[in-house]
């Protein structure tokens, strides 16, 4: 609202308001028409269905965009005009010409036109005449007013300050209409605010992410206890657990930007990312770069995906195998990849939304230096093959998951027998033993595990040279995720 008001004060007659919220922009225009010039001035609303309607009175023969612009140009006195989904794209030379004429005709006359659309489609010829404003989604104050209005309407008891502010934080990223729908659902069958209410808000944000097509909502299934080892990483995450809270925001504590997990395949990088959303109680969205590059305009799709995840913030954005997608740029390579890479770096550096980026990488030698330099991510972690103690923990986790009592197994022996194994290989050994024993209608024994272990050649043997190279590369470039 402030940017629109400042643009009008600055004398801009043509404003392009990029927003999904036509009703909210229209309410703002109503407020401006009543108050901006001290006395009320006319308010016109145009759509291709109704044409131009000024203060409730239809202007004849104005459904055609050019004729609507002519009517605004020849109107008398000051006024505000909201044009919904006005066709400003390429292929409309007569509309473009009339817009440029309108700019000169309305300048310094107190008449202002607000072109409203969720997509930014500006003709090249008119870019200098049109002032672009990305209308921000409701902030905390506006969300609290919507909440208060709903509670009064239904005659319910007002929420206390703590509950209201937590609710406002959870509702960030939704439009005013979406907030109204969610609040109505949440309080339809309850009088108090409970954890289930916040799960409903999470479900609404999941629904929003599906509309973009390249963001996948990842439900919170794993906890930090499901990871064996990674003590340094776990400590880092726990220390930042409360930084997305209302209290931390009010205290001015810097919000974490993100982390990069790189290292050997099969060591649990993806699992570690999935536990962040559970630990921090934030929704997790995975950006599917294959889907991005499968569209007609990968650059536009990628930038829309970033805006979409900002819209559902606070959230965690997971970029898997970043070296093959965003970080796959090479100098002199594909121009679209270059623009995506540049756009991502700029977004990481300047983003103000509450989005934590969790990226993983296997082929770390492919990562451009710009990705791993300080300032992009808060920390770069190297994930190595698990040590003996960590392998014991991993065996415990997967034995329990397969309904086996770890106390019945010699975990020390199993850990020593699987030296050089990664977490995925240990998991598969336990699963294979469970399948074999089930086929024979009996419980899993340690001998089952011994047999599977003896028949397995781990990745550390088949790819010994590559793993040595990965370790050497990461030695001075990243912090080990484990203490040992």
Tell me the role of every PLM-derived stretch:
Residues 29, 33, 106, 171, ...:
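A generic structural signal for well-ordered alpha-helical segments
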Residues 11-16, 24-28, 36-50, 108-112, ...:
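Amphipathic alpha-helical coiled-coil
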Residues 165-217:
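Interdomain "pre-motor" coupling segment immediately N-terminal to P-loop NTPase/helicase cores
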Residues 1-10, 26, 207-275, 307, ...:
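C-terminal engagement/docking regions of AAA+ P-loop ATPases
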Residues 136-177, 190-192, 316, 356, ...:
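Conserved C-terminal "switch" segment of AAA+ ATPases
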Residues 15, 40-114, 118-122, 127-131, ...:
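Walker A/P-loop NTP-binding motif of AAA+ ATPase domains
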Residues 11, 18-23, 89-93, 157-161, ...:
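Conserved phosphate/pyrophosphate-binding and hydrolysis machinery centered on Walker-type P-loop NTPases
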Residues 1-35, 89-93, 270:
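Glycine-rich P-loop/Walker A and Walker A-like loops and their local beta1-loop-alpha1 context
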């Amino acid at each position: 609202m402030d940017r629109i008001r400042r643009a009008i004060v600055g004398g801009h007659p043509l404003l392009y308001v990029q927003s999904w919220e036509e009703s909210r922009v229209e309410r703002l225009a109503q407020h401006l028409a009543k108050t901006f010039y001290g006395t009320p001035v006319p308010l016109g609303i145009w759509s291709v269905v109704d044409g131009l309607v000024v203060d409730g009175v239809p202007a004849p023969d104005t459904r055609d965009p050019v004729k609507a612009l002519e009517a605004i140009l020849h109107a008398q006195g000051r006024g505000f005009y909201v044009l919904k989904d006005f066709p400003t794209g390429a292929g409309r030379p007569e509309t473009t010409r009339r817009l440029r004429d309108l700019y000169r005709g309305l300048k310094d006359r107190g008449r202002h036109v607000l072109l409203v659309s969720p997509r930014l489609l500006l003709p090249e010829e008119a870019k200098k005449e049109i002032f672009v404003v990305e209308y921000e989604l409701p902030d905390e104050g506006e969300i609290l007013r919507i909440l208060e209005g709903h509670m009064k309407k239904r005659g319910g008891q007002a929420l206390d300050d703590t509950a209201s502010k937590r609710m406002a934080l959870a509702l960030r990223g939704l439009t005013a209409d979406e907030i109204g729908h969610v609040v109505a659902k949440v309080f339809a069958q309850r009088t108090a605010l409970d954890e289930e209410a916040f799960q409903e808000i999470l479900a609404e944000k999941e629904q929003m992410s599906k509309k973009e097509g390249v963001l996948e909502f990842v439900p919170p299934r794993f906890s930090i206890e499901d990871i064996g080892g990674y003590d340094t990483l776990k400590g880092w995450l726990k220390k930042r657990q409360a930084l997305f809270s209302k209290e931390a925001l009010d205290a001015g504590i810097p919000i974490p930007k993100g982390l990069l997990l790189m290292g050997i395949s099969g060591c649990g990088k993806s699992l570690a990312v999935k536990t962040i959303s559970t630990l921090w109680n934030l929704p997790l969205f995975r950006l599917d770069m294959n889907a991005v590059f499968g569209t007609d305009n990968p650059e536009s799709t990628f930038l829309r995906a970033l805006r979409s995840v900002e819209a559902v913030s606070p959230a965690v954005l997971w970029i898997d195998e970043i070296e093959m997608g965003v970080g796959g740029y090479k100098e002199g390579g594909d121009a679209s990849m270059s623009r995506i890479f540049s756009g991502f770096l700029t977004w990481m550096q300047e983003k103000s939304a509450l989005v934590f980026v969790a990226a993983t990488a296997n082929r770390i030698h492919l990562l451009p230096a710009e990705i791993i330099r300080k300032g992009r991510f808060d920390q770069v972690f190297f994930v190595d093959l698990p040590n003996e103690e960590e392998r014991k923990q991993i065996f415990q986790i997967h034995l329990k998951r397969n309904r086996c009592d770890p106390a019945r197994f010699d975990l020390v022996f199993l850990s020593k027998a699987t030296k050089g194994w990664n977490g995925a290989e240990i998991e598969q050994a336990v699963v294979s033993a469970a399948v074999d024993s089930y086929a024979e209608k009996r419980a899993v024994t340690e001998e089952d595990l011994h047999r599977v272990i003896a028949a397995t050649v781990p990745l550390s043997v088949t790819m010994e040279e590559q793993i040595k190279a990965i370790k050497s590369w990461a030695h001075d470039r990243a912090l080990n995720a484990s203490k040992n």
